[in-house]
């Protein structure tokens, strides 16, 4: 999931670069104000994505799996610890998905304001954020079969679907504002 977070962070960084370019579609006070708002939000998304790279949940899972299993009570404690560690490990890709989805929403806002000359960077940024989202989603979906709590799995699957819809809409909005990428 670290690679997905790095991809999303790179996409956010590119968008941030575009947001602070001196040339815009319409050099108005309103546009400049909106660009500052978008840049501030992108900076936050980028930093949060970088923080997820440093989140290490594997240690908790390894520790839980190495707990003693001699008695029924120990096996029960071990299973509970494993499930708790799995939830913690599922939260990281879910957060990467949320942040990449937010980055894509900001890309759509930025696409309406940025200069046409930045469209190549915008397309690449959108692709990187989409790759980050897809990588985190794949990582998370691979973990779902390990959960015992069906209601938790259902809530995660519902959030995956919601974020996927949000991401698709934001990517389409950005692409429609940018036009077809150069061949």
Task: Report the location of each language-model feature.
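Inter-helical turn/loop segments and adjacent helix faces that build the functional surface
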Residues: 22-25, 29, 110-119, 143-155
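Amphipathic alpha-helix face/heptad-repeat signature
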Residues: 6-10, 38, 45-52, 85, ...
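A structural-propensity feature for long, helix-poor, extended segments
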Residues: 25-68
């Amino acid at each position: 999931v670290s690679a997905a977070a790095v991809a999303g962070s790179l996409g956010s960084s590119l968008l941030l670069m575009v947001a602070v370019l001196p040339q815009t579609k319409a050099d108005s006070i309103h546009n400049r104000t909106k660009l500052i708002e978008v840049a501030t939000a992108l900076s936050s998304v980028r930093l949060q994505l970088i923080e997820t790279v440093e989140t290490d949940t594997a240690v908790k899972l390894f520790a839980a799996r190495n707990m003693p299993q001699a008695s029924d009570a120990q096996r029960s404690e071990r299973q509970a610890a494993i499930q708790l560690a799995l939830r913690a490990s599922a939260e990281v890709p879910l957060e990467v998905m949320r942040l990449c989805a937010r980055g894509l929403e900001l890309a759509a806002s930025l696409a309406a304001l940025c200069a046409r000359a930045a469209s190549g960077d915008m397309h690449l940024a959108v692709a990187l954020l989409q790759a980050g989202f897809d990588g985190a989603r794949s990582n998370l979906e691979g973990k779902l079969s390990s959960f015992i709590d069906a209601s938790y799995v259902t809530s995660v699957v519902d959030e995956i679907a919601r974020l996927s819809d949000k991401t698709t809409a934001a990517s389409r909005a950005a692409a429609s504002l940018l036009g077809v990428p150069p061949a």
